């Protein structure tokens, strides 16, 4: 089945200037399935970084998320199911989250290993961990008990219609690191691979695709607003890393945030991240499904009996896009939205699926709004609200009527799509993109030609050694001499 044709007027869709990026300056651009994955250090593309400075990160700000984030471990049956999927060579397109459902156990832990009050029914008291979402998306996360102090080799494997990575952790020089280096694992899971094409993993980096970052959100009722945190306990460049994550995911909501985030404030917009939720190859074209991780809204209900009280509810990326003007705004980028990545991907379509408000909101009248903050225009961020929950499940390549809400958001609803329930407002955009082999080659060459270390629009690639040429995706024309030889050998000359 060929991909659908582009909607009218979607051929000229410029990408915005990104403010953060990855510089891949070592390793090979393409990796074989049986090779270990390199760990690239993510850098702020402004070289020196203009995110939070050292003084902007207090002791509690740097350590609290690590100490309180719930831990997630996989069950034996889940790992077995993943193994079966790998062995079967499943290749049926982007599998919906409903088809990839797994069972996970959630525990609370502080930095000393103390087990807190997290429960197995996905109700969190303070922080939210994305490990569950990674399980749902087909990214294999080894059991936590095998991680501390036991670095392993990351192996890429084919699983569930996409490429999963059983990622390695890094040996820690810190005696206090009792949790795995999650952000490093997710970094090379998301930015060192996109999909399986012609027997290889296609490796691409983009300053607009920092997908699958580990994040936690502060849900304390006293905070009054959604607040971004990120686990940044790394063995290299911690301050640069903190600046990068803060710039990409949105600044921490405190009195000094605006002045310390000059990169983002210059655009009057906090930059959303793309989350790659599904990957596939259709007729030698790389296809990805992604949604933009903007803010996590949480229920502001005052009803103490509401099942959703104090839980994170939704990811919101845009404020007030309606069905009539949404496409136009996305294409023209007048609302500060991210378009196709560096003009390398062609936007095919956007989708927005939300759960009905009735029966799924807090408050006795089911009419209390969910408040969100990022990313919206600076002058309206305090008043931005969403009135419905957003589904973050990818469709497969050809559409899927099974819709699942991220378990990691504390919502465990599975339902069939009912178009009558879809409102006109689209708070969440699901973006489908497609790129062919020649575009991949052009993208690599274009990135390699970039010499400006402060480039905000391109990614620097290290040219792979000549010995790795079989791994490179190129189009090689058949020379006249070769044709002549083939004709001669076949007796047709």
Curated annotation (Swiss-Prot):
Organism superkingdom: Bacteria
Biased composition (Polar residues): 1-14, 72-92, 445-472
A Pfam family annotated for this UniProt entry: MgpC
Residue stretches spanning the membrane: none
Region (Disordered) location: 1-92, 441-493
Family to which the UniProt record says this protein belongs: Belongs to the MgpC family.
Sequence ranges of Basic and acidic residues compositional bias: 25-34, 44-56, 482-493
Record's protein name: Putative MgpC-like protein MPN_414
Species assigned in the record: Mycoplasma pneumoniae (strain ATCC 29342 / M129 / Subtype 1) (Mycoplasmoides pneumoniae)
Annotated InterPro entries: MgpC
């Amino acid at each position: 089945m060929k991909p659908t044709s582009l909607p009218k007027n979607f051929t000229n869709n410029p990408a915005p200037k990104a403010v953060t990026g990855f510089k891949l300056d070592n390793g090979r651009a393409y990796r074989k399935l049986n090779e270990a994955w390199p760990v690239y250090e993510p850098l702020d593309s402004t070289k020196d970084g203009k995110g939070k400075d050292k003084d902007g990160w207090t002791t509690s700000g740097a350590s609290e998320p690590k100490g309180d984030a719930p831990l997630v471990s996989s069950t034996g049956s889940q790992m077995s199911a993943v193994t079966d999927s790998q062995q079967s060579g499943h290749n049926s397109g982007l599998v919906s989250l409903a088809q990839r459902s797994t069972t996970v156990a959630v525990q609370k832990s502080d930095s000393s290993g103390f087990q807190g009050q997290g429960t197995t029914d996905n109700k969190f008291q303070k922080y939210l961990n994305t490990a569950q979402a990674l399980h749902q998306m087909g990214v294999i996360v080894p059991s936590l008990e095998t991680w501390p102090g036991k670095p392993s080799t990351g192996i890429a494997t084919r699983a569930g219609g996409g490429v999963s990575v059983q990622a390695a952790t890094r040996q820690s020089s810190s005696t206090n690191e009792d949790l795995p280096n999650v952000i490093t694992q997710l970094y090379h899971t998301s930015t060192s691979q996109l999909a399986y094409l012609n027997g290889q993993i296609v490796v691409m980096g983009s300053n607009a695709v920092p997908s699958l970052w580990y994040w936690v959100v502060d849900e304390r009722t006293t905070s009054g607003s959604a607040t971004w945190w990120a686990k940044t306990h790394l063995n290299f460049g911690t301050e640069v890393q903190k600046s990068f994550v803060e710039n990409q995911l949105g600044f921490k909501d405190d009195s000094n945030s605006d002045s310390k985030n000059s990169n983002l404030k210059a655009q009057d917009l906090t930059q959303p991240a793309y989350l790659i939720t599904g990957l596939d190859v259709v007729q030698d074209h790389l296809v990805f499904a992604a949604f933009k991780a903007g803010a996590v809204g949480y229920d502001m209900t005052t009803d103490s009996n509401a099942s959703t009280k104090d839980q994170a509810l939704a990811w919101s990326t845009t404020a007030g896009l309606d069905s009539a003007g949404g496409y136009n705004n996305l294409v023209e980028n007048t609302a500060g939205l991210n378009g196709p990545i560096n003009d390398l991907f062609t936007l095919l379509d956007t989708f927005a699926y939300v759960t009905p408000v009735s029966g799924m909101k807090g408050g006795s009248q089911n009419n209390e709004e969910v408040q969100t903050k990022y990313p919206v225009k600076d002058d309206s961020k305090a008043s931005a609200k969403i009135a419905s929950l957003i589904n973050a499940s990818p469709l497969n390549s050809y559409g899927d009527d099974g819709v699942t809400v991220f378990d990691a958001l504390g919502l465990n609803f599975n339902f069939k799509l009912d178009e009558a329930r879809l409102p006109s407002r689209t708070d969440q955009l699901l973006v489908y993109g497609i790129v062919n082999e020649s575009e991949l080659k052009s993208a690599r060459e274009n990135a390699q030609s970039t010499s400006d270390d402060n480039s905000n629009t391109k990614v620097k690639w290290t040219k792979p050694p000549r010995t790795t040429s079989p791994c490179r995706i190129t189009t090689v024309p058949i020379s006249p001499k070769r044709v002549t030889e083939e004709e001669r050998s076949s007796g047709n000359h």
